[in-house]
Amino acid sequence: MRPAVLGSPDRAPPEDEGPVMVKLEDSEEEGEAALWDPGPEAARLRFRCFRYEEATGPQEALAQLRELCRQWLRPEVRSKEQMLELLVLEQFLGALPPEIQARVQGQRPGSPEEAAALVDGLRREPGGPRRWVTVQVQGQEVLSEKMEPSSFQPLPETEPPTPEPGPKTPPRTMQESPLGLQVKEESEVTEDSDFLESGPLAATQESVPTLLPEEAQRCGTVLDQIFPHSKTGPEGPSWREHPRALWHEEAGGIFSPGFALQLGSISAGPGSVSPHLHVPWDLGMAGLSGQIQSPSREGGFAHALLLPSDLRSEQDPTDEDPCRGVGPALITTRWRSPRGRSRGRPSTGGGVVRGGRCDVCGKVFSQRSNLLRHQKIHTGERPFVCSECGRSFSRSSHLLRHQLTHTEERPFVCGDCGQGFVRSARLEEHRRVHTGEQPFRCAECGQSFRQRSNLLQHQRIHGDPPGPGAKPPAPPGAPEPPGPFPCSECRESFARRAVLLEHQAVHTGDKSFGCVECGERFGRRSVLLQHRRVHSGERPFACAECGQSFRQRSNLTQHRRIHTGERPFACAECGKAFRQRPTLTQHLRVHTGEKPFACPECGQRFSQRLKLTRHQRTHTGEKPYHCGECGLGFTQVSRLTEHQRIHTGERPFACPECGQSFRQHANLTQHRRIHTGERPYACPECGKAFRQRPTLTQHLRTHRREKPFACQDCGRRFHQSTKLIQHQRVHSAE
């Protein structure tokens, strides 16, 4: 797509030519406004508008082009698919017809899909193709859309200024209209575009100044003549009090972004600049037309002429409001001098208002595309759906980022450890692990963090809201105080303060993130996002080996170790290795004898919280897991799963040595000790070893002379239940 500039810089219009008529497209305003706007559109225009003359040599030109391209595409932030989307969007906009292209560019779409939706909306608008006319305002001709005389209020009869002698234009078929407007029908817009590209006015157009003070005074005078009072009477409001007018009088300029009517200058000579009247109208979906004066050799300014595009012949001539249905816009132009240096500065008096205010929350946006994107938050619209898992997104860029989780593509790779990431921001955060950098420091306690989100989460512990009232972070690079860091509630110590702060959320009960489905609240946003997948059923992380899917990437990582056999967490006491760190933590309590979880009913203590939960069901009698076949209830879901295999006959655990299968994995583990000869349970009294723990328990009763199983008939006691069953058969035979 060509940038929004006209022609070549080395062609200057001849000085002896009169005013040149051009059509100023809406996209030119957007493109020139972007020259001082540090946004993606400004970066694109800087790249497309680069000229070889701006560099001192070919090497510098190539280096500048590379840098401008990098600033536009930002490969360190965007993925290849996102950069491709930018190029497709640019080409799509460039392929549109000129009028539609200007109107779509004015909305600044963020993706090709959004641009296509805008084009569809424009095609469905009522109204046929527009025709353009030549409007002569007191002796000067400009291009405008065709309008009816009833669109304007006539001026009082005044004597027009005497035009200067000069060559007369060939006779044309004209229509007389108020204000001395002479209208002649011209060809379609497409012919105007050809004229723009090949005419003498092929120069760069940039943002513009407001009216000069003397021009502003003349504008106000003529406006008083055009709109002296309303039709309700001579005492009605003037144009300055019009309810839809957004008049600004800054730096001597009068303008309400919008419809501009050019006045004939009293001393209309070569090189003079004519003033403009700006009255309100809607430029959001309007075409622009204008006249640009031929510049002097030193370079100078020229004002653009804006005429309303919504003036229809069917407009009611008796309408009391000549400015009905109009809104703000303003465009003026600036010339570049032949030396290539721009003159003037952007006008600050009345910029283009292209966004709007959200009706729901009142938030204001400078661009309509951002407003439309924001409104999807309130409507819940998510038009971009992932074909793999069905998850929907409000923006196509979010969908592309999400799809990388399915393809396992991680284009941003760490040069130190080789770990890949979907987003470059995650790579930058990961690099701080190697460098030890923690730039975000809490001003309250001095704790440093690698990520700002962790700092904001931490500040809630001190009571500082993560907003304008929060204390600013400490200077980056400040060292963290040395550990360990003990918890004031339970005295547990941690090597890092960040881990301590996460642990303290258990005691403080800080749960700032709530689920809209079930109301459950969480202390961390990441945990809330994982919880939402329980309701949606989403399992975006699938194993490439067996196809099993998981809700969390960490679960997939742990599952892969089943296929690879990796057990990275080893016990320092006995050397036993585990696939998960929590399993190792639980195992270490076997050596230390630690049992931190106590039952409040009976005082029995457990090494695992899960075991405490299961134990408490013996007091409450709760059996939340029921079999769908026989209705039998269980206190543990694992027991229900094992029970259901009785109905299905499933025996998923097979011995690789003899092929015998089992319903439970524990039974397979015990069986394999027959082949390996392993006897891990040894008696501390006599040293005898056993393959199963229950067998060791029974053996210990022989040393302790325990006989817990008593016969109800004769009172005889036994140390094994099997011995009691055999004994009871004696009484049954009698």
UniProtKB/Swiss-Prot annotation:
Induction: By retinoic acid.
Residue positions where Phosphoserine is found in the record: S111
Broad class of where this protein is predominantly found: nucleus
Gene Ontology CC annotations of this record: nucleoplasm
Record-annotated SCAN box domain positions: 44-125
Subcellular location: Nucleus
Tissue specificity comment: Preferentially expressed in differentiating myeloid cells. Detected in osteoblasts.
Record-listed cross-link Glycyl lysine isopeptide (Lys-Gly) (interchain with G-Cter in SUMO2), residues: K723
GO biological processes: negative regulation of transcription by RNA polymerase II; positive regulation of transcription by RNA polymerase II; regulation of DNA-templated transcription
Function: Binds to target promoter DNA and functions as a transcription regulator. Regulates transcription from the PADI1 and CDH2 promoter. May be one regulator of transcriptional events during hemopoietic development.
PANTHER family, sorted: C2H2-TYPE DOMAIN-CONTAINING PROTEIN (PTHR24393:SF158), ZINC FINGER PROTEIN (PTHR24393)
Assembly and binders: Homodimer.
Protein name: Myeloid zinc finger 1
Naturally occurring in which organism (per UniProt): Homo sapiens
